[in-house]
């Protein structure tokens, strides 16, 4: 059930006996829109006015969210006996500025269809601006949910500097690096975020925090005998090297044109590449048609 106050600490961490299905606190349930934010539309219109080429028009993308705020099917409509592919990440997984057909979770599922005997169900739990803590929480809840029963999990870990924070008033928020407007803001909450990045955040803490989140989801996955494909594509080369010596994951980098509709997010070509890497991992992971490690 989607909580009435989704961004509060009390709702985010339900009491015993309450539903613990993952939900997207930054997306209204059952929302259908052509623009995720006013900023997305304003940027698009400014780019068009400046004559910048764009493969998408204003009506080419529809964001359609389920009752838990995710860009996928309703959880109670997962086809029986289907092969459930759970995908998680930030805006690159959710598909900011992209039609759903161009997101990497959708492309991946299309590439997995010839490799499994049953129908493939795409559960995309990507959420823009997610910290890795938030991704790990969603992944763990999904793997423990009998309603979702994923067969395999693909996690495209987010930028490691992001962190999930709870304010004293109980509001929760994923913090990315401060924007230019954040640096000028006098809002006490924004000033607190700025203070964290100016005085506390460090590369070593980011790496330690990411590794702790990886261990969390691996523990849950091992308990339920589910294989996880970790993608470290968004980490620096140094972090990829450190992580790959400790975790079986996808590494690599390439320069892709940021050609989503906002001309900021990565587009179809990047998602074809990462979904190819994930498909290749799946081929060698020893996963049966029922999703358990063989």
Give the role of each language-model region.
Residues 155-156, 208-254:
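Conserved, well-ordered alpha-helix/loop/beta-strand core segments that scaffold catalytic motifs
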Residues 64-128, 132-133, 140:
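Serine-esterase "nucleophile elbow" of acetyl-processing enzymes
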Residues 94-97, 131-133, 160-166, 229, ...:
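Short catalytic/ligand-binding loop motif for oxyanion handling, primarily in non-cytosolic enzymes
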Residues 256-294:
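Histidine-centered active-site loop/cap adjacent to the catalytic His
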Residues 92-96, 125-128, 193-211, 260-263:
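Surface-exposed cleft-lining segments at the edges of enzyme active sites
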Residues 136-149:
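Short, well-structured alpha-helical segments in soluble
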Residues 127-135, 202-216, 266-274:
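Soluble or luminal CAZymes and related metallo-dependent hydrolases
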Residues 1-86, 148-151, 156-204, 218, ...:
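N-terminal secretory targeting modules
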């Amino acid at each position: 059930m989607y909580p009435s106050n989704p961004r509060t600490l009390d709702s985010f961490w339900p009491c015993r006996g309450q539903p613990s299905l993952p939900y997207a606190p930054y997306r209204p349930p059952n929302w259908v829109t052509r623009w995720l934010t006013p900023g997305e539309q304003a940027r698009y219109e400014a780019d068009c006015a400046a004559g910048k080429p764009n493969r998408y028009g204003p009506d080419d993308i529809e964001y359609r969210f389920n009752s838990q705020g995710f860009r996928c099917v309703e959880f109670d409509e997962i086809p029986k006996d289907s092969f459930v592919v759970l995908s998680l990440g930030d805006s690159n997984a959710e598909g900011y500025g992209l039609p759903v057909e161009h997101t990497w979770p959708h492309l991946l599922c299309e590439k997995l269809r010839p490799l499994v005997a049953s129908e493939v169900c795409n559960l995309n739990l990507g959420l823009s601006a997610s910290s890795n803590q938030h991704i790990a929480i969603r992944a763990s809840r999904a793997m423990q949910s009998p309603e979702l029963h994923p067969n395999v999990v693909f996690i495209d870990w987010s930028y490691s500097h992001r962190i999930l924070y709870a304010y004293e008033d109980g509001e929760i928020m994923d913090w990315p690096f401060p924007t230019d407007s954040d640096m000028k803001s006098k809002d006490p909450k924004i000033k607190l975020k700025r203070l964290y990045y100016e005085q506390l955040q460090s590369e070593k803490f980011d790496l330690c925090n990411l590794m702790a989140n990886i261990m969390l989801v691996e523990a849950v996955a091992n308990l339920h005998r589910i294989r996880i494909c970790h993608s470290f594509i968004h980490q620096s080369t140094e972090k990829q090297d450190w992580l790959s010596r400790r975790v079986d994951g996808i590494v690599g980098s390439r320069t892709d044109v940021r050609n989503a509709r906002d001309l900021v997010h990565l587009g179809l070509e990047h998602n074809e590449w990462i979904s190819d890497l994930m498909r290749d991992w799946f081929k060698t992971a020893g996963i049966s048609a029922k999703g358990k490690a063989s």
